[in-house]
Amino acid sequence: MASLKEVKGRIASVNNTRKITSAMKMVASAKLHKAQAAIENMLPYERRLNHILTNFLSADSEVESPFIVKREVKRVAIVVFASNTSLCGGFNANIIRHLTVILDEYKSLGMENVLLYPVGRKVAEGVKKLGFKAEGDFQHMADKPSYQEAAALAEDLMRRFLHRDIDKVELLYNHFRSTAVQVLTRETYLPIDLTQEKKEEDKGRIPDYIVEPSVDVVMGELLPKVLRMKMFTVLLDSNASEHAARTMAMQIATDNANDLLQDLTVMYNKSRQQAITNELLDIVGGSMA
């Protein structure tokens, strides 16, 4: 059995750790609340954009746009969202693990034809370990989501797609569903799949608009806005998922510390009782000698 001094030292150490994890949980919870508020403030605008897009797609005429043209994939770009720091459970590990699966799918293209955009220091480190060179430094976006920076990244990807420098763009991120649930999500960013949008037509009555000067001109303005907003939405989504994962990880760590403290307290009391018993036996034995 461990000595009283050893057990007492372990109790103090676990208690200090519990204070740290509890404080980190409160900080992560506050950041999560802020991230959720940012998403809620942005949702009305995003929903309105998608509503307009759905209305246009309900028309009989086919929409023409270079952003919806599918072509043979010879070069692909993957934007991967993670965090700058750890202590958030399997948040980063799951992203990197799934990224390796995607990279295996595109192995036939060659490493030079798979472009990686890592958003977050942890995934940037993972990309480097996998032998790839990042297309830029986007670490700051993971901590402080900015529409301007997300829009700039979207513009760069749109430009490269239009110039046929890349044939497809994918997004890999954690989708925030609740504090306890974050869903690993893989989406095609470019080309835009309008068939998914057209499914909304059957869900309700679509207003009949007269579009001037033409649907194609309006869509030429609308689709880039949708793409910029999509990038920002995913950035906010990943940020909220990170804070949710860290909140849960710190909650679990705090609960485990509480359980360990209870076990150590029982151990300490048993050790103390054993020490007192031994002293009494020594005293009794000495008096009878």
Swiss-Prot record:
Q: Subcellular location, in the record's words?
A: Cell inner membrane
Chief site of localization:
membrane
| Gene Ontology MF terms | ATP binding; proton-transporting ATP synthase activity, rotational mechanism
Q: List, alphabetically, the Gene3D superfamilies matched.
A: 3.40.1380.10, ATP synthase, gamma subunit, helix hairpin domain
Quote the cellular component terms of the Gene Ontology held in the record. Answer: plasma membrane; proton-transporting ATP synthase complex
Protein's GO biological process: proton motive force-driven plasma membrane ATP synthesis
Q: Which UniProt keywords apply?
A: ATP synthesis, Cell inner membrane, Cell membrane, CF(1), Hydrogen ion transport, Ion transport, Membrane, Transport
Supply the InterPro entries for this chain: ATP_synth_F1_ATPase_gsu, ATP_synth_F1_gsu
Question: CDD domains attached here?
Answer: F1-ATPase_gamma
Q: What does the record give as the function of this protein? A: Produces ATP from ADP in the presence of a proton gradient across the membrane. The gamma chain is believed to be important in regulating ATPase activity and the flow of protons through the CF(0) complex.
Identify its protein family.
Belongs to the ATPase gamma chain family.
Protein name as annotated: ATP synthase gamma chain
What is the species of this protein?
Phocaeicola vulgatus (strain ATCC 8482 / DSM 1447 / JCM 5826 / CCUG 4940 / NBRC 14291 / NCTC 11154)
Encoding gene (name): atpG
